[in-house]
């Protein structure tokens, strides 16, 4: 037992294993702050169009408006639209809420690091990013097995010297393999910063945001 404990301590020392503590000194909070988390209380609403390249021809889009203070979400596609409350009981939530959470993570994941509590993280310095090979700090986020629509998922974030995300790898269920994508075209929208484009290893833009409005 003593040897096992020592081994675990060494592993945690090497990889900076940390419980979730979103205080200003933790790396997850530093990432959130780099995108303007300290000013997020100035935001009343965020509207945007999610675009994903399904194949060489077809693009799927859906429009969202998140009324942050009112805790309501407006959803629209080419053939439907409606508004729902985030305060609804979990078993009454519309299916599109899964899409809202998915799209919001692609757009606002830095802020989720401050909002979410059900994860653990570890850090590793001087790691090349999987696509560009840029030297970075690797921050791995692993969610618990109980919360959310896809519990147990993991995200490897590759950060620059300013704690901005260069690339990430999403690993479903904390599996060993994932698909690396970029975080590009960071723009200022009101008090916060958002990455508006994600490209794959081939350099092809496959997820992007348009019609962004932050009020």
Residue ranges and their predicted role:
Residues 6-9:
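Sec-dependent N-terminal signal peptides
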Residues 22, 46-47, 52, 58, ...:
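N- and C-terminal low-complexity/disordered segments
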Residues 23-28, 34, 38, 117-126, ...:
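Intrinsically disordered terminal and processing segments
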Residues 13-16:
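C-terminal motif of bacterial Sec signal peptides marking the signal peptidase cleavage site
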Residues 24-94, 125-126:
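N-terminal mature ectodomain segment of secretory-pathway/periplasmic proteins
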Residues 1-4:
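Positively charged n-region of N-terminal signal peptides that target proteins for export
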Residues 135-215:
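Gly/Pro-enriched, hydrophobic low-complexity segments
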Residues 20-24, 84-153, 174:
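Flexible, processing/modification-adjacent segments and terminal tails
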